[in-house]
Amino acid sequence: EDPWERLAMVREGAPNILLQMLLRGANGVGYKSYPDNVVKYFVREAARGGMDIFRVFDSLNWVENMRVSMDAILEEDKLCEAAICYTGDILNPDRAKYDLKYYVDLAKQVEKAGAHIIALKDMA
């Protein structure tokens, strides 16, 4: 199966519906890091093939690892949804790092990086 043909068929069959995909930051749609030019090219082809919304995340919430993808999405004038990976209890006073401030600061970072939408991704 050719995923680009599949995307074209879906777009043709649902021309007025927003299509969304998940993008693993520097890993693209794979499980290893890819060079920046590969990630940019993939985003460009997916955007031009009909993808409207790209949900981007990094499993360690490292915004720099999401930036190439986010920049490529914005260059293609598509919607960028930055997903923040969340687990735990943000209101537990015993949690020294992953508290409410951590997630608010992270949300501000992805907003500054250009995210149109911020999602919380439960890692459970």
Name the predicted role of every residue range.
Residues E1-L18, R24, G28-A124:
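Alpha/beta enzyme core
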